Amino acid sequence: MSAPDAGREDTRIPLVAVVGPTGTGKSELAIALARELDGEVVNADALQLYRGMDVGTAKLTPEERQGVPHHLLDVLEIHEEASVAAFQRDARRAVDEIRGRGRVPVLVGGSGLYVRAALDAIEFPGTDATVRARREEQLRERGRAALLRELAAVDPGSAERVKDDRRLVRALEVHDLTGRPFTSFMPERRYVQPTVQIGLAMDREVLNRRLAHRVDLMLERGWLEEVKALEARGLRESPTAGRALGYPQLLAVLDGSATLDEAREDTVAATRRFTKRQRTWFGADPRVHWLDAGDPNGIDGLTAGAVRLVAAQ
């Protein structure tokens, strides 16, 4: 793909998104595509936004990035809360700047809502710390069941979907602030600019074995030591980072409530459950073009297939 004059955004340049479950090789394909298409990579993994969360998020090292510019890595401190609305703003700015340089933006990640926020027409309601604090206090005083009944009266769709207290409080906060149900802010499947979504699929049993091996490699590469260092910086109290896959399990090792073997098994199981949710999320989007991550020609075959998909748009 030939690049137009730098500094002038070319609306013919598509946004390429590489999506799919954890462990399928998305980062490797994104690098290969960026090199092939004269592109730059934009991170859409919510946890790779955090500085210091490297081993446990499989963040590529500078050497592994092979000279390809990367955006939205290491932009948050561990105590900060990740915001999908802020990510949307920053990701779209990065994409526009890349296209303005005449290069191809390659978005990569498995955080479904973050990907949709970057790609699709979606509006995010604001937040209010005072309203949230009041709702959190009500949760402590009145209990989850009472607040769930209140939510069901004004937003039955959200009441059926909320899986934890954080989402329950958020749904009530949104209704308090806007008078609208949280479900009314759900994204449309409508791209805000020309986009090609490429998904990586893998046989479930093969992926499960890869995930177990991946956790073992992370532990060998110093994941427990990483968690110990992050604990000193506020990992336990972090509203987002502290709940990342594997990190609570390793914090339990540090405080003596679990063995390393138990933490490993729990992490592997949690990661497998997470990839199941990712398959459901991305599989529900008919716009995703799926490639077999087990291509017999490896990364070269995947890259060639992805380039053909981009060229066909």
Swiss-Prot record:
Q: Which reaction does it catalyse?
A: adenosine(37) in tRNA + dimethylallyl diphosphate = N(6)-dimethylallyladenosine(37) in tRNA + diphosphate
InterPro entries in the cross-refs = Dimethylallyltransferase (IPR039657), IPT (IPR018022), P-loop_NTPase (IPR027417)
The entry's substrate-binding residues are: T22, G23, T24, G25, K26, S27
Record-listed E.C. numbers: 2.5.1.75
- Any single Pfam family the record assigns to this protein: IPPT
Q: What residues correspond to the site Interaction with substrate tRNA?
A: S111, R132
- List membrane-spanning regions: none
Enumerate the cofactors the protein uses: Mg(2+)
Q: Does the keyword Cell division apply?
A: no
Q: Which controlled-vocabulary keywords does the entry list? A: ATP-binding, Magnesium, Nucleotide-binding, Transferase, tRNA processing
What's the top EC group for this one?
Answer: transferase
- Similarity section: Belongs to the IPP transferase family.
Protein name (Swiss-Prot/TrEMBL): tRNA dimethylallyltransferase
The organism is Kocuria rhizophila (strain ATCC 9341 / DSM 348 / NBRC 103217 / DC2201)
